[in-house]
A protein has these predicted regions:
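Short glycine-rich, flexible loops that bind phosphorylated cofactors or substrates
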Residues: 156, 197, 432-433, 551
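Beta-rich accessory regions
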Residues: 567-569, 575-577
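His/Asp/Glu-enriched, well-ordered alpha-helical/loop segment
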Residues: 238, 353-363, 370-401, 405-406, ...
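Short loop/helix-cap segments at secondary-structure boundaries that form the rim of catalytic
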Residues: 77-83, 301, 415-417
Length: 585
């Protein structure tokens, strides 16, 4: 057995080598260039080789091998002969790890523990799913743990809003606390038991609407949330871990978490220290009171390993299109309403400036064209004050203001976005999910000129996401929707054809991949660290059975990931038979 002195000497040598290896300054480069050092260096590296490696790097777009140490890529090269020892030879085709540019981590985990109402085509189907869920969850519906669900759509109820009485399915349901989120999570549908908690008469809420007894939308939701029993940290931890596993399964290594409360950030910071934290999170702060300034409740966070990043805030300009809540310049085509703003223009501008001055990137939820106009106004005014001695475009490159959804934008405001360089955060599957009703709601002209822009905004390097759990957290479905403008569920457009819905707004496969890799990295101040396979970047990658660029587009609808790696560690491996994707001839 080696003596204590020998072990101490070896430990000291190893530490010295590690320091030299991590700090190759000019004075010690002769050491790092020696054959002996290269041999020792391999002890700290692990090398992986695949059939192809798509890197997203300008210097070397495609490679075959890379080495990893301390959670980062160290070298990327074409073949194993350019390196002395190959430590891991694998089959498969590699892409940089995928990022979802707009999702909701906690809500995804909570949905996985709730009633899934997506696709429920009738009131009977909703009630059937609630009864089935309750039979398995006796604790659901108590005052301590409400029965939760998400995914209903009044369009499936013959266009009529549901009411609280619809939730009294049988005698067992009459005394239950039930809260169900609409498909866009901008409205809730609650039981009479929940309504009994509210003041009588129910007060009017600026920026909120109560379209039916038991349905509350946008700011009116806050009336109920005062009484909602928040899940314990134990349950929240369960939500997060289950959601992260689901995301890893889909090849997702990082997300922009679009609205995290201060109390949740405390839990995030604690959990991010553990190995079970397998998704990088760029979190947007959302104050407990929406559209306020709460810097004392949060702090900028950037963990050394890059697992948690907090440097942005989320504000809300309007609601959602599906519930007529998005704020429009002109009234809807199918309703004598223009939607509603959740905040006035002056407050939005002041909040933007205050948050930016406090060191936070500002991301504004805006769907309607009026909301998008006010968001652009707020950004422009803030930039003028923040950088009086530089151009607005230069200032924007520093602060990187974003519009979340950027769904309906007047042509004049599209030009302003390009002039300022405002980053659009787009969800391609929103276009294909909304196409069945969007034209009747907005009219053909607004759809053709303003709505669901993708190709029109490419010069702004748009961030792509899914808005999970509103849409499935499947990036390949998002890529399919962006490239084809067809539903990833059916493969068809709004008319039942295959031409695509307003196909002039399609993007290329390469553009779509950028939207889920390098563009989210830039929008999170992580360029060179995420969305790319090159020296110094986080060692995050996914493995597919075939190169994605060789696949027929229809294969994307069923594509699955073979492996997902985060920080050089495998966090997901597919089991079972390998699916056979359709390959181009």
């Amino acid at each position: 057995m080696p003596s204590f002195g020998t072990l101490l000497s070896l430990s000291t040598l190893a530490l010295l080598i590690a320091v030299v290896y991590q700090n190759p300054e000019p004075l010690i480069r002769p050491i790092t260039g020696s054959i002996a050092f290269k041999i020792i260096q391999q002890l700290f590296e692990h090398t992986h080789c695949y059939v192809t490696v798509k890197t997203n790097s300008v210097d070397l777009p495609y490679a075959e091998c890379f080495s990893v140490a301390n959670g980062k890529f160290k070298r990327v090269f074409l073949d194993e002969t350019s390196y002395d020892v190959v430590k891991d030879l694998r089959k498969g085709h590699v892409l940089p790890g995928l990022w979802d540019g707009h999702g909701h981590l906690m809500q995804l985990g909570e949905l996985m523990d709730s009633v899934n109402l997506f696709g429920a085509g009738s009131m009977d189907e909703v009630q059937k799913r609630l009864v089935q869920y309750k039979a398995l969850r006796q604790e659901a519906g108590t005052s301590e743990q409400w029965l939760r669900g998400v995914g209903w759509d009044q369009a499936n109820f013959e266009g009529k809003w549901p009411v609280a009485k619809d939730l009294e399915i049988n005698d067992k349901f009459k005394d239950l606390y039930v809260m169900l989120d609409r498909v866009d999570v901008h409205c809730i549908w609650v039981s009479d038991k929940v309504l009994s908690l509210l003041p009588n008469p129910t007060p009017e809420v600026p920026g909120g609407e109560i379209p039916a007894d038991g349905v509350l939308c946008d700011n009116a939701i806050d009336l109920v949330m005062k009484y909602y029993p928040k899940p314990s940290n134990e349950r929240r931890t369960k939500f997060i871990r289950e959601a992260m596993f689901e995301l890893n399964k889909l090849g997702i290594v990082g997300i922009h978490d679009a609205g995290v409360y201060p109390a949740e950030l405390v839990l995030y910071q604690e959990l991010s220290k553990n190995e079970s934290w397998t998704v990088r999170v760029n979190a947007m702060v959302e104050c407990e009171a929406r559209n306020t300034f709460c810097p004392d409740d949060v702090a900028n966070i950037s963990t050394p390993d890059g697992r948690l990043h907090v440097q942005s805030v989320k504000l809300f300009a309007d609601g959602a299109l599906g519930s007529w809540g998005s704020a429009m310049i002109e009234p809807y085509s199918d309703k004598s309403s223009s939607g509603s703003l959740l905040v006035d223009a002056e407050t939005l501008t002041k909040l933007t400036h205050k948050w930016a001055k406090a060191g936070y990137q500002v991301n504004i939820h805006a769907i309607g064209d009026l909301a998008n106009r006010l968001a652009i106004d707020a950004f422009e005014e803030a930039l003028k004050v923040l950088c009086p001695d530089s151009t607005l475009r230069e200032c924007q490159s520093k602060y990187r203001f974003r519009i979340e959804h950027a769904q309906i934008i007047h042509p004049d405001d599209q030009r302003r976005m390009h002039e300022l360089g405002i980053i659009p955060s787009i969800q391609p599957t929103h276009a294909t999910s909304d196409m069945s009703y969007a034209e009747s709601r907005l009219g053909k002209q607004r759809i053709a000129e303003e709505a669901y822009r993708m190709r029109s905004l490419l010069r702004l390097n748009p961030v792509f996401g899914s808005d999970f759990p509103v849409e499935p957290a499947n990036i390949f479905e998002g890529i399919y929707a962006a490239v084809t403008r067809r539903s990833p569920r059916t493969g068809l457009d709004a008319g039942g054809g295959t031409n695509g819905w307003y196909p002039s707004e399609t993007v290329t496969l390469e553009d779509a991949l950028d939207g889920f890799t390098i563009n989210p990295a830039y929008a999170a101040f992580l360029e060179g660290k995420a969305g790319v396979i090159e020296a110094g970047a986080y060692a995050d990658w996914i493995v597919l059975d075939e190169p994605i660029e060789t696949l027929d587009m229809e294969a994307l609808r069923k594509l699955t990931v073979k492996e997902t790696w985060v920080g050089g560690e495998m966090v997901y491996r597919r089991t079972g038979p390998v699916p056979l994707p359709w390959i181009k001839n």
